[in-house]
Amino acid sequence: SLASFQSRKGTALDNFSYKAEAQVASNFKKLSLNAEYITYYAPNRRWTMRVFAGTFLSNNANDNYYDFNVSRVNDYLFQYDLYGRSEAEGFFSQQYIKAEGALRTTGNLTSANQWLMTAQSATTIWRWVEGYAEIGWVKSMHQNAETHWGTGITFNLVPDFFEVHFPIYNSNGTVFTNNAYPKNIRFQLSLRPASLAKLFSRSWF
């Protein structure tokens, strides 16, 4: 079963939103909270801050299917516009969904079966170019908590609708030195009516 509560306050230029969620199944119980603040401090210049925290009250699952995901959501409840659900490689496997941990890069940390906390911030550098920084703390059962952080550039072509993320440096080192760098590029694309509504409410400012 699923229970959730969400709220959004403010205007198109300065707003705060949050969502609290509880999931209960025969083999797990978990709680999560997601909060985001967005402000346009000058014409076409914005600053965003997002935090996520999730914990299992109990977890008897035999695999990681219901884990909190650090970067790529599993979306077993079909809540998001995830276009490559079964893809482990290729273009659609690099889709970025701003849900759960929502880090752009993760290294070897992919999910957490005990608790997960992440924080992300981004600000406009020039027009539709943003710089971002993010950090996450990942804890799975019988393992020590681990930390992963990263920085990069986002081409914010259409806010919350079409964005491309280019990691630059993270806790594993300089991403650009990796020959497989193109696989680290993430794209965000949403065709949901709610996203389109937010697009038109902001595009006039």
Language-model features: where?
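C-terminal outer-membrane beta-barrel translocator/porin domains of Gram-negative envelope proteins
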Residues: 1-124, 141
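Membrane-spanning beta-strand positions in outer-membrane beta-barrel proteins
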Residues: 46-48, 128-130, 161-163
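Generic beta-strand/beta-sheet core signal
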Residues: 52-54, 132-134, 156, 165-167
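Flexible, surface-exposed loop regions and adjacent strand-edge segments
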Residues: 65-72, 146-148, 181-186
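Conserved C-terminal beta-signal and adjacent last beta-strands/turns
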Residues: 117-122, 135, 151-156
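Long, low-hydrophobicity, solvent-exposed regions enriched in small/turn-prone and acidic residues
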Residues: 127-129, 133-139
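Strand-loop-strand
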Residues: 146-176
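Outer-membrane beta-barrel "beta-signal"
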Residues: 155-161, 181-205
